[in-house]
Amino acid sequence: MKEEKKLLLQEVEEKISASQGFILLRYLGFSAAYSREFRNSLSGVSAEFEVLKKRIFFKAIENSGFEIDSSDTGGHLGVVFAYDDAVSAAKQVLDFNKQHNDSLVFLAGRIDSANLSGKEVEAVAKLPSMKELRQQVVGLLAAPMSQVVGIMGSALSGVISCIDQKTQKN
């Protein structure tokens, strides 16, 4: 291997080890403006998009001790390295993809120490986030409490109404 490729391989291996996960993508019809917009959207979730040579990426994966299915890797490939939360990065990729006519195809990924297929990464991206799940739980807990408060309030107003009617009779 040439020295440049060795340095690139080492850099990719470092990114793999530093990241919480990564998503392998095929990109279609990506202009420079799309690429810049995609990179900017990922910066908000502590992730970055890299266009890599297939051979370099798969060699880095192999050297890192991971296994990724490389059978469907035709076309231009890019990798999203997620440094904070890989699920948030996957959600961001899915949102960007919806806004830009499905120009990205999920091929594979590694999220929370699990090797995933492209369909599995996409399914994870469609799940509600932790924040959304917390909001749902709070809503479920708050609904019965507000009903109890309403019932107690109506019971108290009933008692007050009875007392008021008694005082008016006398």
Curated annotation (Swiss-Prot):
Q: Which InterPro entries does UniProt cross-reference here? A: Ribosomal_uL10, Ribosomal_uL10-like_sf, Ribosomal_uL10_bac, Ribosomal_uL10_bac_type
Which GO terms label this protein's molecular function in UniProt? Answer: large ribosomal subunit rRNA binding
Q: Which Pfam families match?
A: Ribosomal_L10
Descriptive protein name: Large ribosomal subunit protein uL10
- CDD domains, sorted: Ribosomal_L10
The organism is: Chlamydia caviae (strain ATCC VR-813 / DSM 19441 / 03DC25 / GPIC) (Chlamydophila caviae)
The domain of life for this entry's organism is Bacteria
What is the similarity comment for this entry?
A: Belongs to the universal ribosomal protein uL10 family.
> GO annotations under biological process?
translation
Question: Which UniProt keywords are present, listed alphabetically?
Answer: Ribonucleoprotein, Ribosomal protein, RNA-binding, rRNA-binding
Q: How does it assemble?
A: Part of the ribosomal stalk of the 50S ribosomal subunit. The N-terminus interacts with L11 and the large rRNA to form the base of the stalk. The C-terminus forms an elongated spine to which L12 dimers bind in a sequential fashion forming a multimeric L10(L12)X complex.
Q: What does this protein do?
A: Forms part of the ribosomal stalk, playing a central role in the interaction of the ribosome with GTP-bound translation factors.
Q: Where does the record locate the signal sequence feature?
A: none
Name the GO cellular-component terms.
Answer: ribonucleoprotein complex; ribosome
